[in-house]
Structures are given as C-alpha cells and as structure tokens.
UniProtKB/Swiss-Prot annotation:
Family: Belongs to the UPF0391 family.
Pfam short name (any one): DUF1328
HAMAP family attached to this UniProt entry: UPF0391 (MF_01361)
Name under which the protein is recorded: UPF0391 membrane protein Csal_2627
Organism: Chromohalobacter salexigens (strain ATCC BAA-138 / DSM 3043 / CIP 106854 / NCIMB 13768 / 1H11)
Keywords carried by this UniProt record: Cell membrane, Membrane, Transmembrane, Transmembrane helix
Length: 52
C-alpha cells in the first residue's frame, strides 16, 4: 500500500511540474489518502504487537 502512495506522489509531482492542475490535484489527493491509511495501519500494528 505504501508503494501506491509513493507512485501517486511521484505522479502528482511530475504533473505539477508539467502544469496539469487537475491530474496533479487528483494524484495528490489519492497519495495523501493512501499515506494516512498506511500510517493508521502501521500505528495499529505497533499497538497490537506491543500487547504480546
């Protein structure tokens, strides 16, 4: 899942440099959502493993 976030972040950066506002905005939004989902899952896995 982190790979998808990185891929969409790279697409957003490239599209932003080239000036494609709509594509950059959509890719950046997807990258942000995937990043936060991954971050939440990471924190949950840390908390659950600490209990064992």
């Amino acid at each position: 899942m982190l790979n998808y976030a990185i891929i969409f972040l790279i697409i957003a950066i490239i599209a932003g440099v080239l000036g494609f506002g709509g594509i950059a905005g959509a890719a950046a939004t997807i990258a942000k959502v995937l990043f936060f989902v991954f971050l939440i899952l990471f924190i949950v896995s840390l908390v659950r493993s600490r209990g064992r």
